Every structure is written in structure tokens, then in C-alpha cells.
Amino acid sequence: MKRKIALLLITGICLANTVPCFASPSMKVSVSSSEENQYSTLPDGDTLQKDVGFRPKAPASLAGGYLFGSGNITESFDLDSNGAPVNKQKGISFKYIKKDNNTSKSVSLSAEPASGQSLSSNASVIKYGETDLYYSTAEANSLAWIDGDVRYILMDINK
């Protein structure tokens, strides 16, 4: 367990730079898109710009021997007081896989525009240089940060 936490922290630190943040009072909903919007190979910056409207960092591998496995476009939005979707935006979710003998482990790295996003208030905050890293175990072991205008979440989906 401590190794997983350390791996999440190290990988997050490698990808993080600066962290401004902004709070949103409405409920956030995220939805993964259909299979037609999936990537079997790592997309380049131009493809991501065209597909989701921004250029998130998209490393081929992560610390600890995790390699790109797949990716898909996500859509997130807030719900207004009537339950109608507002503030729709696209994001990206990449799955990284590590294979050891007969065991396969995976982590997820997601990115979406940071505008109007808040980071978990239940998380432990770890300062790394100028970057605040938010570690949480609420849904899974996750590490979140904002770099420029992109919000990243690294999640251990094996929990």
C-alpha cells in the first residue's frame, strides 16, 4: 500500500508544475464516451487539441514501469438546480498498465480544463515546489493537481 502511495506521489510530482485553483458550487458529473472515441495508441498534441480542445500532457509511460494501454474522451458537466447539464467540457482519460509475470496492474491519468474546477477538500495536501498535490482515498487512491489551465487526476484503479 505504501509503495502504491509513493508511486502515485512520484508520478504526480513528475507531471506537475504550478497549481492555481478555483472552486465551483455545483455538482460535477463525468461520463466516458463511446468506443468510437477510444485511442489504442498514444495520441499526439495536435490530435488531442482537435478531439478535446486542449493539449494535456500525455506521457508514453509513468514511473514504476506503467506503459500506455488505452485512452478515451470523456465529457464532464455541472448540473444546475433543475438537474440540467451546464458548463459542458471534454476531457481525456488514459489507462497505463504494468505487467509483472502473470499479474497486470493499471492506473488512470485523466485531464480536463481546469476552469471552474475545485480540488477535493477531503484530500491531504502535499506541497512540492510551487505545486500543491491533493492525495485522496475517498473513491480510490488518487492524486490531483492543476498545471496551467489543465486539471490532472492520477488514480490507482486497482483499489
Please report, for each region that a protein language model flagged, where it lies by residue.
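Surface-exposed amphipathic alpha-helical segments
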Residues: 148-159
